[in-house]
Amino acid sequence: MSSQPVTFQAPVAPIVPTAWPVDDVLALFNLPFNELMFRAQTVHREHFDPSEVELATLLSIKTGGCPEDCGYCPQAARYDTGVTAQKILPLEEVLTAAREAKAHGATRFCMGAAWREPKDRDLEKVEEMVREVKAMGMETCATLGMLGEGQAEKLKNAGLDYYNHNLDTAPEFYSNVISTRDYQNRIDTLARVRNVGIKVCCGGIVGMGESRLQRAGLIAQLCNMDPYPESVPVNNLVQVEGTPLHGTDPIDPLEFVRTVAVARITMPKARVRLSAGRREMGEAIQALCFVAGANSIFYGDKLLTTGNPEALADQELLEKLGMHTRSTAIDARCDVTPS
């Protein structure tokens, strides 16, 4: 392992864990469950109200037709998943969705597009969406694929708060998931985003057939970024018929909880978000994830093209747990630079 921390200066070399070597992250995974949960909750309480959860909404502004071959994704054009390619949504349709999300308590509005990378003419439309949603008093996030030179600056100038670009998995497992984009492509995009002052939303997907060591490797990659992401989505694979990963043995639910806990311990100031796969978890596992340090969820009946718990079900769960939602778009603790 290299002894030098990685800094965001595009282009950058692949991230090599230093402050949290993979073996140390793996040791957290291997702790007795109660000990791991205690440590995660202790860290969580040092930086956040343990009863608060952030509501974020994710809208697909351009669905289907993606040329990539991500093995988990129903939006890849090469897979027969029943997803029909659509053009980018009109501005007013996006704004209507944002208004509805805000009315239901969401403080962050995320816009996703199934592109390998955005064309400049499409990026201009996204910039307008960002400006208008930002004017509503909501935080803005976009996930548009890889960004070329100058594109991150345009999004920053439009007022974008966060850019999502997941690492997906550990470098050692990456070739089992995707072949049309390499790991360095992802690192380069994250570097461009970080260098212009946009906050980074970056996490991964578990349950794709990876080992515990490889899950530890993913978290080591994330937590050794300098700085680590402000927002860390943890996705549980939603298996979609027609994709190569359909039929993969699912991850044990308690192993998913462990993953959330390890993310919290290694990235103490990040928003750790329960993302895809919540509908399949059930209330008990979601509750354990909150104890493990998750403090953000995607709210709404759909995430891009896959299902999500109904809004009413989420409200009822949070009431059962005595949790409350983040009430403003500005959270001073979340804005502190991670360290």
Swiss-Prot record:
<dbReference type="InterPro" id="IPR013785">
    <property type="entry name" value="Aldolase_TIM"/>
</dbReference>
<dbReference type="InterPro" id="IPR002684">
    <property type="entry name" value="Biotin_synth/BioAB"/>
</dbReference>
<keyword id="KW-0408">Iron</keyword>
<feature type="binding site">
    <location>
        <position position="66"/>
    </location>
    <ligand>
        <name>[4Fe-4S] cluster</name>
    </ligand>
</feature>
<comment type="similarity">
    <text>Belongs to the radical SAM superfamily. Biotin synthase family.</text>
</comment>
<dbReference type="InterPro" id="IPR006638">
    <property type="entry name" value="Elp3/MiaA/NifB-like_rSAM"/>
</dbReference>
<keyword id="KW-0949">S-adenosyl-L-methionine</keyword>
<dbReference type="GO" id="GO:0005506">
    <property type="term" value="F:iron ion binding"/>
</dbReference>
<feature type="binding site">
    <location>
        <position position="141"/>
    </location>
    <ligand>
        <name>[2Fe-2S] cluster</name>
    </ligand>
</feature>
<comment type="subunit">
    <text>Homodimer.</text>
</comment>
<keyword id="KW-0001">2Fe-2S</keyword>
<feature type="binding site">
    <location>
        <position position="73"/>
    </location>
    <ligand>
        <name>[4Fe-4S] cluster</name>
    </ligand>
</feature>
<dbReference type="GO" id="GO:0051537">
    <property type="term" value="F:2 iron, 2 sulfur cluster binding"/>
</dbReference>
<feature type="binding site">
    <location>
        <position position="110"/>
    </location>
    <ligand>
        <name>[2Fe-2S] cluster</name>
    </ligand>
</feature>
<feature type="binding site">
    <location>
        <position position="273"/>
    </location>
    <ligand>
        <name>[2Fe-2S] cluster</name>
    </ligand>
</feature>
<keyword id="KW-0479">Metal-binding</keyword>
<dbReference type="Pfam" id="PF06968">
    <property type="entry name" value="BATS"/>
</dbReference>
<comment type="pathway">
    <text>Cofactor biosynthesis; biotin biosynthesis; biotin from 7,8-diaminononanoate: step 2/2.</text>
</comment>
<dbReference type="GO" id="GO:0004076">
    <property type="term" value="F:biotin synthase activity"/>
</dbReference>
<keyword id="KW-0808">Transferase</keyword>
<feature type="domain" description="Radical SAM core">
    <location>
        <begin position="51"/>
        <end position="278"/>
    </location>
</feature>
<feature type="binding site">
    <location>
        <position position="201"/>
    </location>
    <ligand>
        <name>[2Fe-2S] cluster</name>
    </ligand>
</feature>
<keyword id="KW-0093">Biotin biosynthesis</keyword>
<dbReference type="GO" id="GO:0051539">
    <property type="term" value="F:4 iron, 4 sulfur cluster binding"/>
</dbReference>
<dbReference type="Pfam" id="PF04055">
    <property type="entry name" value="Radical_SAM"/>
</dbReference>
<keyword id="KW-0411">Iron-sulfur</keyword>
<dbReference type="InterPro" id="IPR024177">
    <property type="entry name" value="Biotin_synthase"/>
</dbReference>
<dbReference type="InterPro" id="IPR007197">
    <property type="entry name" value="rSAM"/>
</dbReference>
<comment type="function">
    <text>Catalyzes the conversion of dethiobiotin (DTB) to biotin by the insertion of a sulfur atom into dethiobiotin via a radical-based mechanism.</text>
</comment>
<keyword id="KW-0004">4Fe-4S</keyword>
<feature type="binding site">
    <location>
        <position position="70"/>
    </location>
    <ligand>
        <name>[4Fe-4S] cluster</name>
    </ligand>
</feature>
<dbReference type="InterPro" id="IPR010722">
    <property type="entry name" value="BATS_dom"/>
</dbReference>
<protein>
    <recommendedName>
        <fullName>Biotin synthase</fullName>
        <ecNumber>2.8.1.6</ecNumber>
    </recommendedName>
</protein>
<dbReference type="GO" id="GO:0009102">
    <property type="term" value="P:biotin biosynthetic process"/>
</dbReference>
